[in-house]
Design a protein with these regions (language model features):
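Active-site metal-binding motif and surrounding structural segment of the metallo-beta-lactamase
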Residues: 1-23
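Metallo-beta-lactamase
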Residues: 15, 20-67, 71-143
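Short, electropositive alpha-helical surface patch
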Residues: 140-161
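Short metal-coordination and nucleic-acid-contact micro-motifs, chiefly zinc-binding Cys/His arrays
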Residues: 168-170, 196
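Short cysteine-rich clusters marking metal-coordination/redox-active sites
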Residues: 174-177, 200-203
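Short, non-ligating residues that shape and space the ligands of small metal-coordination modules
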Residues: 183-184, 209-212
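Short linker/helix segments within small regulatory modules
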Residues: 186-198
């Protein structure tokens, strides 16, 4: 299920030649996704909760029209165990922006982006939602902890100016998917000593996409 056309979300679709790949019809046209295993979605199943258009993909899995970040942007909601897991792509780049009600820094339609974020926040306010961001480690932490968002209780964040860069942890974070490379989990091998062709285990990006934690 592809939320939007940007390369950091679609760049390795070729790795799944036998999978059905769902994307909104608008994104399929924009990204020229015209292959036998690509399924354009038209959101013909009517409203889902407070969202106006949706498509049921499987039992408990829904594709939701959520324009703004791109003109054909979508979100995925998976229902399980009384929780609603929201894979939102880049409706917000960080969880802090969700809590602060701030738009993504990238959008193709600012009016649609505002409407989508308002709808996302309204949904979260009435459904126990695990918010799965893709550009911050919080997405994976939320998933592992099955932590539902409480918009009235934002997580504590530390201003950049207060971070003690001198106390290096040896950890590096992938700027694309949020994967944390911890030498302690890799036989003590420092990130700097990894081979040049090393790839992120999660998104397969190169070392140049990593920043010091």
């Amino acid at each position: 299920l592809i939320t939007h056309k940007h390369a950091d979300h679609t760049g390795e679709l070729r790795a799944f030649p036998n999978a059905k790949i769902y994307a909104s019809r608008e994104e399929c046209k924009a990204d020229e996704l015209q292959y036998p295993n690509v399924v354009p979605v038209d959101f013909t199943d009517g409203p889902y909760a407070n969202f106006e258009k949706s498509q049921k993909i499987a039992e408990g899995v829904y594709f939701i029209e959520a324009k703004g970040h791109t003109t054909g942007n979508s979100i995925v909601i998976a229902e399980d165990g009384g929780l609603y897991y929201m894979i939102h792509g880049d409706v917000t780049y960080t969880d802090e922006a969700l809590y602060a009600n701030k738009l993504s820094v990238v959008f193709e339609d600012i009016g649609a982006a505002r409407k989508t974020l308002d709808s996302v926040r309204e949904f979260i306010g009435t459904h126990p939602t695990v918010y799965l961001s893709t550009h911050t480690p919080l997405g994976y932490e939320n998933l592992e902890a099955k932590a539902a968002v409480d918009l009235n209780d934002p997580p504590e964040s530390k201003p950049v100016g207060e971070i003690l860069f001198g106390q290096a942890s040896g950890k590096y974070v992938c700027s694309v998917c949020g994967y944390v490379y911890d030498p302690a989990e890799h036989n003590g091998v420092a990130f700097e000593d990894l081979p040049d062709d090393w790839k992120c285990p999660r998104c397969r990006q190169g070392r140049d996409k990593f920043n010091r934690a």
